[in-house]
């Protein structure tokens, strides 16, 4: 039996940034280039409401573009960048140039060996194994 990944943090007061069927970039070297969000782990919403996800949330993605070995497969991923501005507790507003995810294994370790581009500090605090591969934490 596989261990359950503990998802930490509160979702209260978050802006709906990425939802079902959002197309995102893959920010690691696992073989995928573009992915589509098809599920949000830990989302407890209202019937028929479209689930949404934000920075540092774990989502289920389907790889749409990439190497033939990973295309048309489903993976778990963590959102590390989002275009929609969000507010930090100190009052600053942060937004990135693109929406990006890092593909992870079922045990929570990154599938790739490097992360391209910056990642958000919220994702680095919640997922330290991803932060160890990142070149820049904003």
Swiss-Prot record:
The lineage of its organism: Archaea, Thermoproteota, Thermoprotei, Sulfolobales, Sulfolobaceae. GO terms for molecular function: large ribosomal subunit rRNA binding; structural constituent of ribosome. It comes from Saccharolobus solfataricus (strain ATCC 35092 / DSM 1617 / JCM 11322 / P2) (Sulfolobus solfataricus). Belongs to the universal ribosomal protein uL14 family. InterPro entries: Ribosomal_uL14, Ribosomal_uL14_arc, Ribosomal_uL14_CS, Ribosomal_uL14_sf. The keyword rRNA-binding applies. The gene is rpl14. Binds to 23S rRNA. Forms part of two intersubunit bridges in the 70S ribosome. It is found in: Cytoplasm. Keywords: Cytoplasm, Ribonucleoprotein, Ribosomal protein, RNA-binding, rRNA-binding. Pfam families: Ribosomal_L14. HAMAP family: Ribosomal_uL14. Part of the 50S ribosomal subunit. Forms a cluster with proteins L3 and L24e, part of which may contact the 16S rRNA in 2 intersubunit bridges. Contacts initiation factor aIF-6. One of its GO terms (cellular component) is cytosolic large ribosomal subunit. This is Large ribosomal subunit protein uL14. Disulfide bonds: none annotated. Its main location: cytoplasm. GO terms for biological process: translation.
């Amino acid at each position: 039996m596989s261990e359950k990944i503990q998802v930490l943090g509160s979702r209260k007061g978050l802006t709906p940034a990425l939802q079902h069927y959002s197309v995102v970039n893959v920010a690691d070297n696992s073989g995928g280039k573009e992915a589509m969000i098809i599920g949000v782990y830990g989302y407890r919403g209202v019937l028929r409401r479209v689930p949404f996800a934000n920075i540092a949330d774990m989502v289920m993605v389907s790889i749409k573009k990439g190497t033939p070995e990973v295309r048309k497969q489903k993976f778990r991923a963590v959102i590390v960048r989002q275009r929609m501005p969000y507010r930090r507790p100190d009052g600053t507003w942060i937004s990135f140039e693109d929406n990006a995810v890092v593909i992870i294994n079922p045990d929570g370790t990154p599938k790739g060996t490097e992360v391209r581009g910056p990642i958000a500090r919220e994702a680095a605090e919640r997922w330290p194994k991803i932060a160890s591969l990142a070149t820049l934490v904003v």
